[in-house]
Amino acid sequence: MASSSSNRQFSHRNVNTFLTYPHCPENPEIVCQMIWELVGRWTPKYIICAQEAHKDGDMHLHALLQTEKPVRITDSRFFDIEGFHPNIQSAKSVNKVRDYILKEPLAVFERGTFIPRKSSFQGNPSKGNSEKKPSKDEIMREIISHSTSKLEYLSMIRKEFPYDWATKLQYFEYSANKLFPEIQEEFISPHPPSSPDLLCNESIKDWLQPNIFQVSPESYMLLQPTCYTLEDAISDLEWMDKLSSQQMKEQESRASTSSVQQELGNLLGPEA
């Protein structure tokens, strides 16, 4: 139960994903190809995977994944490869993450073209006005691509567009809720299953017949002041049951006989 609860609370959304597979001796090329296929819907652009060894000889893998669209998952087991479960993080500084992966690799595999992160949304002020400033749309695109949570998204907007943040906060909050929706927890009924199961139709019928549709001897005694014992009540109820059954059979017999006579009359036609 604890594992399912933690899995429901997990959420990852980013175009840059940093994965670490501990105790994993798998080939980096095989792992890269499998991850590439897993994220096909988000249009992968680049992946690098490096194998490293601890001092005790234990192998582990590091991988950096870059996609055109943000990878959006709520299943913490999504990136599991051959039973190996990774630590999943958002790579806020892809340049540093890539350098870290390449520090002491035993084996490396790359696919695609690495996309370095821009040093600043507003450009480099030391270069004066010679470098064109990014447009508002470009800055927002960077914020949407690199923010990893609702709080970080709003904080980045506040930093880059303080006036817009102060005057149009409700619109930014709306977009934040769309980008990072709340994870709905699975409903767990506070009431344990009943025994017998009340959803079982057969059990309900078995209970209805003697308790609702039939008169109990005790109820009959309450309704009949002249009935003093339980045996008398049972005897009266049995007699009434037999009598009503007999009367129903007689009615059915008369109805069937009348139906046959009507059919014969229709066949013979009216008398002359």
Swiss-Prot record:
Q: Where is this region: Oligomerization?
A: 175-187
Q: Which GO terms describe its cellular component?
A: host cell cytoplasm; host cell nucleus
Q: Which UniProt keywords apply?
A: Activator, Covalent protein-DNA linkage, DNA replication, DNA-binding, Endonuclease, G1/S host cell cycle checkpoint dysregulation by virus, Host cytoplasm, Host nucleus, Host-virus interaction, Hydrolase, Metal-binding, Modulation of host cell cycle by virus, Nuclease, Nucleotide-binding, Nucleotidyltransferase, Repressor, Transferase
Chain residue ranges for the region called Disordered:
119-138, 245-272
Q: Name one Pfam family in it.
A: Gemini_AL1
Question: Its family?
Answer: Belongs to the geminiviridae Rep protein family.
Question: PROSITE patterns, alphabetically?
Answer: CRESS_DNA_REP
Q: Which residues form the CRESS-DNA virus Rep endonuclease domain?
A: 11-114
Q: Polar residues composition bias: which ranges? A: 119-128, 245-264
Work out whether the entry's keyword set contains DNA-binding.
Answer: yes
Relate the protein's function as given in its record: Implicated in enhancement of V-sense gene expression. Acts a an inhibitor of C-sense gene transcription.
Where on this chain is LXCXE motif, interaction with host RBR1 (motif)? 198-202
Please, which domain of life does this record's source organism belong to?
Viruses
Q: Give the compositionally biased regions (Basic and acidic residues).
A: 129-138
* EC number(s) given by UniProt: 3.1.21.-
**Gene3D superfamilies from the xrefs?**
3.40.1310.20
Name its GO BP terms in alphabetical order.
DNA replication; symbiont-mediated perturbation of host cell cycle G1/S transition checkpoint
- Which residue numbers does the motif RCR-3 cover? 100-103
Enumerate the subcellular locations listed in this protein's record, separating them with semicolons: Host nucleus; Host cytoplasm
Entry note: cofactor = Divalent metal cations, possibly Mg(2+) or Mn(2+).
Under InterPro entries, the record lists: CRESS_DNA_REP, Gemini_AL1_MSV, Gemini_AL1_REP, Gemini_AL1_REP_central
Q: What is the taxonomic lineage of the source species?
A: Viruses, Monodnaviria, Shotokuvirae, Cressdnaviricota, Repensiviricetes
Q: Does the keyword DNA-binding apply?
A: yes
Q: What is this protein called?
A: Replication-associated protein A
